[in-house]
Structures are given as C-alpha cells and as structure tokens.
C-alpha cells in the first residue's frame, strides 16, 4: 500500500497525541469526552472513542482534522463546503438501521450498536481524491466491506452492490429544497461491481481520527473507496442491495458526460471542465499556502486494483 513521506502533507500532531491517550486509558466504544488537550471542542457524541486496530506504523502524515471535518461535499446539507458542518450538527444518527437485501442468501439488518461491534474495526490511512481536483489524507476507522458481503452470502446473480443514503427531508435540508441540495434527485445512490466491493481496500467507515464519524462526514456509516473519486464514497448509508443489473447512480443520472459509473482516479482522463492531471492538497495553510501535486493513477493504488479493469477502456468507461 502506498505511503507518504513526511513532506507530502501537513502532519496531524493532535491525532497522534489523542490516540496515545485513548489507548493508554484502555477506552473503547463507550462514550468518552476528552478534556481540553489542545484540540477544538466538539459535541460529546462525536468524541466517543473507537476500539480499533492501528494502521501499520510509517511516515503517514495527515490532513488536519479541522479541514477533514470542515471542508466537505454532502449536498443533503448544502452545496457549500462549510454547509455540511453547519447544517448537519443536529443530525440524529442513533437509532439507525442498515438493511442488507437483494440477491443474497442471508438478508439482515444492523442497528446502530451493531455497526460498531459486528466486525473488528481497524484503522486505514488512505489518500482521498475529490473529482474537483483536491485531495486529503485521512485516517479512517472501519471494516472491510468484504466482511459484510461474506455475511450476506450473495447469490450467483449478484453482480453489483448498490448503496442508498438516508432519505429524511426534515433532517436534510438539501433533500427538502432542490436548489439548496444541488438539483439532485434524492435519495443519493451509488454502486460498485461485486469485485470492487470484495477488494480488501474497500472500507465501510464508522469513524475517523479514532472517533465516531461526525455527521458532516457521513455518520454513522459511509463507504470509502480510495482509488475512486470521492463522490463514489456514499455517506449515511441505510440500505445495501445486491443486484444482477447495474443501476444508474446519482451523478451518472444528473450529468453522465461528466461523472461516469466507474469514477476511477485517472490523471489521463480530464473532467470536461478541468484537468485531472494534478490536485490541490488540502493542508494546514490558507490560500497563500496552496500546494499542488501530480495525481497518481488509481490515486496511488494501481498495484492493488488495476487487475479489476483488465481489458476495460478507462477513457470510455470513466
């Protein structure tokens, strides 16, 4: 798995400090409100520590936590980057249910607690590349989607895995007001091939920076597919359906000439309105500290995922 040098991204010192404290105290999924140790105060339900297996040690240097939680695309809460943190602050994620259905032998439902204790949680530090040509490095906490797929026991007809975001216009103003929500036909829907879903890199995340996901980042559970553009990593999932046929996903329906089904990070295939050859790195600096770097094929995960697309024309199947 590709790693960063210490000069690639602004370090997140606070994350390492907090994780050491949490681990030393032996605290797990129970509620934990940390005292003021140098990071911004947040709602107590966002400070619940998660019990997880650390990512392998290395020179991973992370995007500052306040940028990860304050610079978001989540159109259900508005199209401005700051809107999700502002309008999702009272979003209720407990109780919650995640339904597994479709072409499976073992359909089931997970409640809120089961999202955190059904599968062993682990930390994954991944590059995150938005289709808008900006990037972050984020320490997710979650479990491989493959574990859930194996529990569901898909039938031989299951070729695609379809994900559905919660539809709740009373809580999600972007669903209530189409202008506020970017003109999207909600609920938001995304999908992967069954092979993509089973790849070890594909993660269902329930946390970041050692804590439960905040609402603006897709609480309580979201998809993370690090070799694809960020819009594939659907948030606040309530249903996963196994299907024989490929659906038309949300952005594919809205603008098919701009957003394809596969959405693999590819510096050789530009968006119709901008280049994808490089990306703006979201770091600790302001506008005067903008850093750009070359975009890597499959976002740097080519060795792990290129075989999934053997024989596929990635310029046509973008």
UniProtKB/Swiss-Prot annotation:
Class in the EC hierarchy, top level: oxidoreductase
Enzyme Commission code: 1.8.5.-
Primary localisation category: periplasm
GO CC term (a single one): periplasmic space
Signal sequence segment: 1-40
Subcellular location: Periplasm
Any GO BP annotation: protein repair
Cofactor, how bound (note): Binds 1 Mo-molybdopterin (Mo-MPT) cofactor per subunit.
Cofactor(s) the record lists: Mo-molybdopterin
Catalytic activity annotation: L-methionyl-[protein] + a quinone + H2O = L-methionyl-(S)-S-oxide-[protein] + a quinol; L-methionyl-[protein] + a quinone + H2O = L-methionyl-(R)-S-oxide-[protein] + a quinol
Molecular-function annotations in GO: metal ion binding; molybdopterin cofactor binding; oxidoreductase activity, acting on a sulfur group of donors, quinone or similar compound as acceptor
Keyword terms, alphabetized: Metal-binding, Molybdenum, Oxidoreductase, Periplasm, Signal
InterPro entries: MsrP, OxRdtase_Mopterin-bd_dom, OxRdtase_Mopterin-bd_sf
Known role: Part of the MsrPQ system that repairs oxidized periplasmic proteins containing methionine sulfoxide residues (Met-O), using respiratory chain electrons. Thus protects these proteins from oxidative-stress damage caused by reactive species of oxygen and chlorine generated by the host defense mechanisms. MsrPQ is essential for the maintenance of envelope integrity under bleach stress, rescuing a wide series of structurally unrelated periplasmic proteins from methionine oxidation.
Complexes and interactors: Heterodimer of a catalytic subunit (MsrP) and a heme-binding subunit (MsrQ).
Family: Belongs to the MsrP family.
Protein's name according to its UniProt entry: Protein-methionine-sulfoxide reductase catalytic subunit MsrP
Species: Actinobacillus pleuropneumoniae serotype 3 (strain JL03)
């Amino acid at each position: 798995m590709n790693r960063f040098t210490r000069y690639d991204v602004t370090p997140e010192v606070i994350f390492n400090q907090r994780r050491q404290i949490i681990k030393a105290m032996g605290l797990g999924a129970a509620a934990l409100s940390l005292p003021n140790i140098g990071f911004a105060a947040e709602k107590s339900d966002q400070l619940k520590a998660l019990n997880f297996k650390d990512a392998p040690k290395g020179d991973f240097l992370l995007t500052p936590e306040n940028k990860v939680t304050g610079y978001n695309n989540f159109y259900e809460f508005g199209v401005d980057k700051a809107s999700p943190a502002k309008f999702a602050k009272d979003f209720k994620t407990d109780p919650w249910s995640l339904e597994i259905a479709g072409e499976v032998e073992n359909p089931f439902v997970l409640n809120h607690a089961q999202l955190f204790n059904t599968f062993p949680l682990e930390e994954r530090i991944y590059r995150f590349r938005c289709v808008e040509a900006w990037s972050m490095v984020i320490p997710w906490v979650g479990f491989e989607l493959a574990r859930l797929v194996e529990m569901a026991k898909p039938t031989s007809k299951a070729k695609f895995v379809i994900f559905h975001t919660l539809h709740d216009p009373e809580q999600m103003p972007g669903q209530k007001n189409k202008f506020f929500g970017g003109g999207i036909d909600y609920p938001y829907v995304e999908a992967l091939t069954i092979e993509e879903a089973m790849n070890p890199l594909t993660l269902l995340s329930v946390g970041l920076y050692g804590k439960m996901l905040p609402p603006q980042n897709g609480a309580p559970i979201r998809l993370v597919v690090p070799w694809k553009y960020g819009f594939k990593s659907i948030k606040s999932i309530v249903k996963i359906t196994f299907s024989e046929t490929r659906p038309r996903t949300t952005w594919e329906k809205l603008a098919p000439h701009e957003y394809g089904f596969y959405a693999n990070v590819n510096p050789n295939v530009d968006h119709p309105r901008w280049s994808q050859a490089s990306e703006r790195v979201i770091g600790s600096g302001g506008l005067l500290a903008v850093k750009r770097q070359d975009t890597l094929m499959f976002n740097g995960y080519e060795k792990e995922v290129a075989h999934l697309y053997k024989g596929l024309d990635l310029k046509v199947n973008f």
